[in-house]
A protein has these predicted regions:
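Catalytic core of carbohydrate-active enzymes
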Residues: 5-15, 20-238, 245-246
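Phosphate/diphosphate-binding loops
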Residues: 1
Length: 255
């Protein structure tokens, strides 16, 4: 698996959506879409490029969801490439097992399908049919549901609603997620403006992981002062307010 390979020293892997060499009779639209969304929140993936394993082969609803998730993948490119740069510096894989990421939380080690994508996102792949999934969020930290914006305390197993248009991904409190603009292909990327928006999971504490990172976070008197967010949309967590002053952004508790 990607997590085992990553733990063996190979930081980035690629996997194909579906299995081109096996009987596709069991490939339902739900299974295909869950597989695709798992690929979107992985280090790298590819379509098989064969009849019967492309998004339009599974109906209009699946195709519509697939388009949405592919837009998400393009928006994640700055973060994923930043995680790859981080791997080159630290040796940590882009997809990090729970045991590797949370060595002091023995319960986390039992959840061997969940993983961190980079340092900021916890991904819980949906591996069974249905619209709910059980997720363990590691103790000692808080986690923000990317689908709903709800904040969860760690150290507990939660049952999360997960419709076909949703996927269980959680932002790690204290981190930021830097997103690029939506695109149809990488040729539309503007190398001079790779970022479009920043999502904050609680009060920012850590410098974000993002390609060519020039964003810096400094804490002072209960607030975070951030440089490098000029021209970007900022989506703070509930209870925080944003104030811009020249090239600096101040994040503080709402009064």
């Amino acid at each position: 698996t990607a997590l085992s390979i990553g733990a063996s020293g190979l930081p980035v892997q690629v996997h194909g959506i579906g299995s081109a060499t096996r009987d596709r009779a069991g490939m339902t639209p739900e299974l295909y879409l869950r597989w695709l969304t798992a690929g979107v929140f992985s280090s790298n993936f590819a379509f098989q490029g064969v009849d019967g394993l492309m998004p339009w082969d599974f109906g209009e609803e699946t195709l519509a969801h697939a388009k949405t998730w592919m837009q998400w993948r393009y928006r994640l490119v700055p973060y994923v490439l930043g995680a790859i740069e981080d791997s080159a510096r630290t040796g940590l894989p882009v997809q990090r097992s729970m045991a590797m990421s949370f060595p002091n939380d023995p319960h986390a080690h039992d959840w061997d399908l969940q993983y961190l994508l980079g340092p900021a996102l916890l991904v819980a792949p949906v591996t069974e049919p249905g619209k709910q999934v059980r997720v363990y969020l590691p103790k000692g930290e808080a986690w923000w549901d990317l689908n709903t914006g709800h904040r969860y305390e760690g150290g507990t197993t939660w049952t999360i609603d997960c419709e076909l248009g949703q996927f269980p991904v959680f932002g790690r409190e204290g981190h930021m997620l830097c997103l690029g603009p939506a695109a149809q292909h990488t040729g539309e990327f503007n190398s001079a403006r790779i970022l479009d928006e920043v999502w904050m999971f609680g009060m920012p504490v850590h410098n974000p992981v993002v390609m060519r990172n020039k964003i810096r976070v400094m804490q002072m008197q209960g607030s975070s002062y951030i440089k490098g967010l000029e021209g970007l949309r900022i989506s703070p967590s509930e209870g925080l307010e944003v104030k811009r002053r020249g090239a600096e952004v101040r994040i503080s508790r709402a009064r």
